[in-house]
Amino acid sequence: MIRIRFSLVFIFLWIGLTACEHKDLCYDHPHFATVRVIFDWTKISNHDKPEGMRVVFYPTDDESNTWIFDFPGGEDGEVELPENDYRVICFNYDTDGMVWKENGSYTLFTADTRDVRSPDNRTMAVTPPWLCGDHIDEVILKDIPEGSTKIIRLTPVNMVCHYTYEVNGIRGLDRVADLRAALSGMSGSLNMSGDSLPADLSESLLFDGMVSRNQIIGGFYTFGHSALEGEPNVFRLYLKNRSGSMSVLEQDVSDQVHDVPVAGHIGDVHLVLNFDYEVPSEPGSGGPGFDVDVDDWDDVNVDIVL
């Protein structure tokens, strides 16, 4: 009887210790929530849906431990991640040429552009690709009943402006072998969670153009004009003739840029420039093309609507 009683005590003690061990493991193991991400595309009307969307979940207690999910075609989908409080940023991932900075911080995450040397050796920035996105400051994924799904709705909006331009009054366009254009007083970066421009940044953007009949035309995307007060917007046109001679023309277009109403930093602009200039035919010291130095230069094709 004593031996049986001792055996029973040992068995109950072992069960109790085992139960405690499993309970501790349960507390240490994170519970996962099922989240259905829905994209509402009603705010995008001037562009096709992107190749895909990237959604970044930032835990409020540890921003460095992000959870990142891709949604091809910008289609809805379900994901699982640990129960926690999050902040969320989404953006299209077909953004070749974009430089992402501070992506480990919700408040500092920035879309930036690469530096480039202009034909007259000035430091400028390339223009960004098309960008859309959304953000949510608070998503609570805690105490979700087992078997249920939390729905998160993201509404991407356009995050870049579309600038187009036309240059008139230039004679001898048949002598132009290459051309570039630039616009000063612009912003080369964008804060993603605030959808806002840096307050202290003013850069010149470098972009392409083309000869079309008796005009030079072009278009590009930009985050918008600089938020700095009093920064002029000067349009510079670089022309190189077939003999290698370079001409640089410039015109202040600040009024045209700032006369367009903006929503936040977004406002599409069409610039009209009128010159009285003839492209020279005499030879220059260089070749007929520009040597633009930029890391991983990517051509961005933009539809031009005039």
Spans of model-derived segments:
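Bacterial Sec-dependent N-terminal signal peptides
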Residues: 2-3, 13-43, 295-303
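Sec-dependent N-terminal signal peptides
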Residues: 7-10
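Short structural boundary motif marking the start of a folded domain
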Residues: 30-36, 53, 84-86, 161
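Structural motif
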Residues: 38-50, 166-174
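Tryptophan-paired
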Residues: 54-102, 177-258
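Short, low-hydrophobicity acidic/polar segments
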Residues: 67-158
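A sequence/structural signal for flexible, mid-protein segments enriched
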Residues: 126-217
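Hydrophilic extracytoplasmic domains
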Residues: 230-306
